[in-house]
A protein has these predicted regions:
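Basic, Lys/Arg- and aromatic-enriched nucleic-acid-binding interface segment
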Residues: 1-44, 48-49, 58, 68-71, ...
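Catalytic-site neighborhood detector that most strongly recognizes the C-terminal catalytic loop/helix
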Residues: 5, 13, 66-70, 105, ...
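DNA/chromatin major-groove-contacting recognition/catalytic segments
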Residues: 17-21, 73-79, 83, 87, ...
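C-terminal catalytic core of Y-nucleophile DNA break-rejoin enzymes
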Residues: 23, 67-87, 95-120, 136-137, ...
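C-terminal catalytic core of tyrosine-transesterase DNA break-rejoin enzymes
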Residues: 31-35, 39-46, 145-172, 179
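Short, polar N-cap/turn motifs at the start of nucleic acid-interacting alpha helices
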Residues: 54-61, 138-141, 160-179, 190, ...
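C-terminal secondary-structure termini that scaffold catalytic or DNA-interacting sites
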Residues: 87, 91-93, 101-105, 131, ...
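Short helix/loop segment immediately N-terminal to the Walker
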Residues: 126-141
Length: 201
């Protein structure tokens, strides 16, 4: 079971070596999906519906709209993520999804992407860190959403300022997004580059 926000149980995270294990174990579009989540801090549904029109390879940025808040988020490309996107770039239809096969699939439910991710975790030999929740329910501390927490933790471990971490994980309003400056973009790019590389994929 996914970890409900109201449970009060701390969400788990993945260290870089574990993220690499996930990417190496995953197949097809899942490899890029995991990298998108880890290097942008985006939620599962947002990662699946990112479009090529939001990818700026020259500017090394990726822009998407959060389904939960409606906020537009612009994040910087990590070198690992940029390398993989460069390999896939070249479409003349920028409105299409980066992950067209996964974009049409459900995220929740027994056959949803969240459960599929758990299978990848088990195949990679990683612990879901299952704990007892309210009542008799058993819940997992490490799910796909833990990649979002891992992103912010990785930035914090590299002493990236909290305000920059907040920008990278999403603004609260469109007005905040419009306050972006070139200087801030450079700061965001420098912050993301501090996350350790996953090595060859």
């Amino acid at each position: 079971m996914e970890l409900p926000e109201a449970e009060g149980v701390e969400r788990g995270t993945f260290i870089p070596a574990e993220v690499k294990m996930l990417v190496d174990t995953a197949e097809g579009e899942w490899k890029l999906l995991i990298m998108l989540a880890y290097f942008t801090g985006a939620r599962l549904s947002d990662c699946c519906r990112m479009q090529w029109e939001g990818v700026d390879l020259a500017g090394e940025t990726l822009t998407y709209t959060q389904a939960k808040t409606g906020a537009k988020v612009t994040g910087a490309h990590h070198p690992d993520l940029m390398a993989r996107l460069n390999k896939l770039a070249g479409t003349d239809k920028p409105e299409i999804f980066i992950l067209p096969q996964l974009a049409s699939q459900r995220t929740s439910g027994r056959r949803g992407l969240s459960e599929a991710f758990k299978k990848i975790m088990r195949k990679a030999g990683l612990d879901l860190q299952t704990v007892k929740g309210a009542g008799k329910r058993m819940i997992s501390r490490r799910t796909f959403h833990a990649l979002r927490h891992s992103f912010t933790s990785a930035l914090a471990n590299q002493n990236v300022a909290s305000e920059l971490r907040m920008k990278l994980t999403g603004h609260k309003t469109e007005r905040e997004h419009q306050k972006y400056t070139h200087h801030e973009s450079n700061n965001l790019r420098a912050a993301v580059r501090k996350i350790p590389s996953l090595g060859s994929k």
